[in-house]
Amino acid sequence: MSQVAFDFGQSEAPRRPKKPERLILMVLLEAPVGSQALEIASEIQTANGIQAKLRPLDHLHISLQHIRDDKRLREKYVFAAKRAANAVVAEAFDVCFDRIVTFPGGRPDRRATVLLGGSTALMDLQCRLGVALISNGLRGALSFNPHITLFYSSRSVVPQQIDPLRFTVRRFSLVHSERGLTKYNILESWLTQAKWH
């Protein structure tokens, strides 16, 4: 007797990591800047014959501190991260991203093609956030490689200079990333102080 498979219109739930709830401090790109970044990504894909899904506009960001991954979001870590960020005061600053590369690590079918760049002020903000996180009992990094992920693909692009993407960082945010669902929840944001000349 044969069995018949029925499709009731229910799609399979996305596969998620064992620790799917990520807590991260980041600079989310404002929409006009993100649109410019996606234009650059599209041009790079066309020039290299790459077909890959671009990162969503509202997910384009510069990671400042990857705090932790958990099976569920823990309020005590959210509280400590907010307290750390509250202790850091920063003035608005400019950044410039003018190189594009594909990171060699990761899964062979999911290598990240990114914009590279930054500024001294960005490095300083990241380091001070790291110190504040550590003093609040959390993991904090004191240095990093500033980048903006554009897309993931099995193909790499040749490292190259591009027309600079310049913008002003006016805020940073604590984000709960629901890994595997492509969903960001902004828990709190901090405005940088206006620049005075």
Which ranges hold each PLM region?
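Histidine-dependent nucleotide/RNA phosphoesterase domain, centered on the 2H-phosphoesterase fold
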Residues: 1-197
